[in-house]
Design a protein with these regions (language model features):
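Basic (Lys/Arg-enriched) interaction patch that binds polyanionic ligands
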Residues: 174-225
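Ferredoxin-like alpha/beta domains used as RNA- or RNAP-binding modules
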Residues: 1-178, 184, 207, 214, ...
Length: 251
């Protein structure tokens, strides 16, 4: 186990113990997919305190882990907000990317862990950030590259677009990683195994070289040079022992 993971586990353990013993709500900053996986793997060893993993919308990847106080379980309020960022003048607006928005926010001195998902559509952006940073960003995030923008805090998530995805369905001999990667990339199983062994495949943000890893459903899979996918829930068992599955490719 790497030192970074050991420190993360220790921090989560301390948060859970404090939340449970003092009956107070405590939370992390935004966690990566890999950190969320570490937490899920250790959750059974933590004190019996209720928790919420939330990133602001169902398809979010970066999420905040909140340990709840007993009195707060029905009144949970996330410690983050959503910023809506729009061009001040669309006529002169550039075509901006996720990297442009993230870079502009971090150039204001905001650490990556303070920033959740950033969703783009039609020249607008929605960025989830920790609440303690929101007022500063609303006042100071006025330029993305060479485009003047207006930044405000919004509670209206109805406009928030869902990621565009291509549905890929098929059957696999098992829900092992190599079988699912073969379906995602339209590869032979042997070729898929080579991608995995060559460290070209990530599962929930962490490089995975275990070709026989069994997937549960909901994992984010990245294949270098091919794309990013979300694995759906395994379906029914078909003829000849094959399992029907659906994966979604991010466009």
């Amino acid at each position: 186990m790497e030192k970074e993971e050991q420190l993360f586990r220790k921090r989560i353990q301390e948060l859970a113990e404090n939340a449970y013993s003092r009956d107070i709500p405590l939370h992390t900053d935004f966690l990566t997919l890999a950190e969320q996986t570490v937490f899920q793997n250790m959750s059974a060893t933590l004190p019996p305190v209720k928790f919420v993993l939330s990133g602001g919308f169902p398809m979010s990847e970066r999420k905040v882990l909140c340990f709840l106080a007993s009195y707060e379980e029905e009144l949970y309020a996330p410690p983050f907000v959503c910023l809506k960022i729009v061009p001040a003048n669309r006529r002169f607006a550039e075509e901006l990317t996720h990297r442009d928005y993230l870079g502009a926010i971090m150039n204001l001195g905001i650490e990556r862990a303070m920033i959740g998902d950033i969703v783009l559509q039609d020249g607008n952006a929605w960025a989830f950030v920790m609440e303690k940073m929101s007022r500063y960003l609303a006042e100071n995030l006025t330029m993305i590259r060479h485009t003047s923008v207006v930044t405000g805090i919004t509670a209206d998530f109805s406009e928030l677009p869902e990621p565009e995805m291509e549905e890929i369905s098929g059957t696999v001999s098992s829900v092992r990683l190599d079988s699912v990667i073969a379906l995602c990339g339209r590869l032979s199983r042997t070729r898929a195994a080579s991608y995995i062994e060559d460290e070209k495949v990530s599962v929930n943000g962490a490089v995975c070289t275990n070709v026989s890893l069994n997937l549960r459903g909901g994992e984010i899979l990245s294949i270098r040079g091919i794309g990013k996918f979300r694995f759906g829930e395994p379906g029914n068992l078909k003829k000849k022992g094959r399992t029907s599955v659906v994966v979604y490719r991010y466009k």
